[in-house]
Regions:
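Conserved alpha-helix/loop element of class I SAM-dependent methyltransferases that forms part
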Residues: 2-17
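Conserved class I S-adenosyl-L-methionine
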Residues: 15-25
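Conserved SAM-binding loop of SAM-dependent methyltransferases across substrates and taxa
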Residues: 26-38
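Conserved SAM-binding motif I beta-strand of class I
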Residues: 41-46
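Conserved SAM/SAH-binding beta-strand->alpha-helix loop
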Residues: 48-50
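A short, conserved alpha-helix within the catalytic core of class I
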Residues: 103-115
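Conserved beta-strand signature within the Rossmann-like core of class I S-adenosyl-L-methionine
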Residues: 118-132
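Substrate-binding/catalytic lobe of Class I Rossmann-like enzymes that use SAM or dcSAM, i.e.
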Residues: 131, 137-195
Length: 195
């Protein structure tokens, strides 16, 4: 909602350039920014090739005059863009919305920001951060009574078994979500019930 309300002001403050999004997700957050900037190039970085393809397909429909470049990589580690004709001589505007940086350790956050600064070559970074949340609210969200979070996490074991020929028995694990006061975050884990 904030991006939609203030996209024009953000575009005026950043100036023109190619948008580089760190972790594309469903690509909905970048839509208003691309519209306001009128960017001719959008570079999406994501570890999931299928997420890149799906997100860029939708964006290309909504922004037919913007060249879409997907880069499958660990966007937390990348400090330079690969060679690509559309990416040459473009001023770069970084985009890392949401609150993902809050999930990093302080050291990893600093390393990510250093890499982003190098990758953006002096261009601005639009960074989304979350305000501190109450412990009870976070625990209710990540250890919900309906068990959606646990089911999602336990599904990872099924995917591991299917996609990587693993042999983990989901019945031998339990989901745990714990509030870490010092880091102001939830840490989720699958804990073995076996010795």
């Amino acid at each position: 909602a904030l991006l939609e309300l203030h996209a024009d002001a953000i575009a005026a403050a950043t100036g023109p350039g190619m948008v580089v999004e760190f972790g594309i997700g469903n690509a909905r957050k970048v839509d208003p920014l691309l519209t306001a900037l009128g960017s001719s190039v959008f570079a999406a970085l994501d570890i999931s090739l299928s997420a890149l393809k799906e997100a860029l397909s939708g964006l290309a429909t909504r922004h037919p005059n913007t060249a879409m470049v997907g880069i499958c990589c660990d966007h937390t580690q990348l400090n330079e863009l690969p060679a690509h004709p559309a990416l040459e001589r473009q001023r770069r505007i970084g985009f890392f919305p949401g609150s993902s940086l809050g999930n990093f350790t302080p050291e990893d956050a600093v390393a990510f920001l250093r890499n982003a600064r190098q990758l953006l070559a002096g261009g601005p970074l639009l960074l989304g951060l979350d305000q501190p949340r109450e412990q009870a609210l976070m625990e209710a969200a990540y250890d919900d009574a309906a068990g959606f979070s646990a089911a999602f996490a336990l599904n990872l074991l099924q995917r591991l078994n299917r996609d990587l020929q693993g042999d983990a028995d989901p019945a031998q694990f339990r989901y745990r979500a714990r509030w870490q006061e010092q880091q102001q975050r939830i840490e989720m884990a699958l804990v073995s019930t076996q010795n």
